[in-house]
Amino acid sequence: MPEGGASISNTEQGAAAGTERPDLTPHRRTGLLVTFLLGSLTAVPPLAMDMYLPALPEVTRALHAPAATVQLTLTTCLAGMALGQLVVGPMSDRWGRRRPLLAGLGVFVVATVLCALAPTVELLVAFRLAQGLAGAAAIVIARAVVRDLYDGMAMARFFSTLMLISGVAPIVAPLIGGQVLRVTDWRGVFVVLTGIGILIGALVWTRLPETLPPAERHSGGVGEALRSMRGLLADRSFAGYTLTGGFAFAALFAYISASPFVIQEIYGASPQTFSLLFGLNSVGLVVVGQINGKVLVGRVSLDRVLGIGLAIVLTAATALLLMSLGVFGEVPLAPVAVALFVLMSAMGITLPNTQALALMRTKHAAGSASALLGTSSFLIGAIASPLVGVAGEDTAVPMAVVQLAAALVALACFVGMCRPWKSDGHTAGKSDGITAGTTAGKSDGITAGTTDGNTAGKSDGKTDGRRASVEGADS
């Protein structure tokens, strides 16, 4: 029995299968419930952010605060999620995945209750910071669990599957938020979010087994964690994919932070109309993410797909800036909504592939690698967030400028640091679930790529055994 009561079985059977070709259908290897649970964990950040979005104008009025100050409630939550991942990721490498995850979810629930009770915008900002710090455990450990269970192309497929689940959150969250505002005020949004946090925590407690065996945990303290992160950042490709994903996320978060004001204040849409548009954009992201996982991965180089995604984001951001500047005259909401839909949909082939390509560079420090991935994304997003409000609420130019600048920097990092034209390990032909072709870099002093057949077989035996263990816990 693992910690918390979730049962584990069939480990030896899975380990014995190390020489077989892994089944790339994620739910068959991991179990439907655990797959859904991991997706729910990755959905905690969009739930915490997006459910609250329709209430931003009301918070501005209710707490008598300027829009820029209210937007800090988004920025601080995002910054908390960034910094929290740096702490929780290495903790999960040392103490396993379950205990830090359960502790983080508990604090998240308490912080959400305090947000609902906040009497001033200053306290709301502080409580949102605490909420973000605690919520970081969900996303960073979910990614680390995936890395525990999968390698190579199978990992890329699984991330796309998680996007199908976690992508429901941006669709449903603003709709829930908009409906809550019909019957109560903005505080009710945090009450509902508290209930969701309790439900996810209960599922983790009862259904998610430990995926990092004690023998593979790091025994060192802060020093070892820092050395591990330094080793990861010394790998230019890992750093390049991490920064590429971070700046792509900044373009996404510029939309998240500014769109409530652009759509509701500039174009006069209701909170319910905004929620529907936001949900439609999230549908585009989910659908494209599934095309990525079920059609493109294994057939087209991940680097090539990522490059196409970045080009689409850049094109959509350019169109938004031209419309915001009035180059085409007075533009109605529809063309702006189309451009935002295209930008959001392109994230479905951008974000999961940057995560998979970066995590292919490491195996023995998945928590630290996941922490660096998440921290860069959330920290860069937190910096971008207040920039969209510097010119006030009556123009969309700052949002478009931030999106375009972020897309340009993301593309520069991808081309300049990742050097996709030299990639030989992320092509369609290497979809056997083994971390193929990543012989260039070392992660925390351990060679990330293994070209020796025996070593690869051992690595696959471990991940197969873990997947069998999780499947046993889900049955």
Task: Indicate where each model-derived feature is located.
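A late C-terminal transmembrane helix in Major Facilitator Superfamily
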Residues: 355-393, 403
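Conserved MFS/SLC helix-loop-helix module at the cytosolic interface between two early adjacent transmembrane helices
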Residues: 83-122
